[in-house]
Amino acid sequence: EVGVKERVSSLSTRSIKRESKLQALNYVVSMCDLTTLEGEDTEGKIHQMTAKAIRPDPTDDDVPSAAAVCVYPSLVSTAKEIIGTSNVKVASVSSYFPSGQVPIESKLLDTQYAIDEGADEIDIVINRKAFFEGDYRKVFDEIVALKEACGDKHLKTILEVGELRTYDNIK
């Protein structure tokens, strides 16, 4: 135990070189998604956010682009148009984000619409009602169906862990 405390103490006094800090920060930026999911989203807001994703720091060409922008399905084509040939992806929420409280058929239509609009990635929410009722098979089957609908598009599942209430629910 004493050895561990000494090692931790020595680590906390070490400084990280500026170059290493910048490298780490650039790596983090390159993995981030810029997201806007507000009722007041407009094409202008999407343009502003997308420009920031492409060039997070207009004064420094060494700062990489963000990984993606995430928008509602109805704004995917706008984001896609602005992205142009940059390497930034366009992600879209689907499955009636944020609640997910609709039949799977509606979720599939929502997902297909986002893909048809040009989404590179789909972000879904799980059926929390089914989860809280213990119907884990339904949750699983819906995720499988949505992944099949995505084809080769990347699928991410958003877990509202704050709503899962207990550590036992976070499995």
Positions of PLM-derived features:
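Alpha/beta enzyme core
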Residues: 19-27, 40-64, 74-171
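Charged, compositionally biased N-terminal leader segments and the immediate start
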Residues: 1-30
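A short, histidine- and acid-enriched strand-loop-helix "catalytic/donor-clamping" loop
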Residues: 37
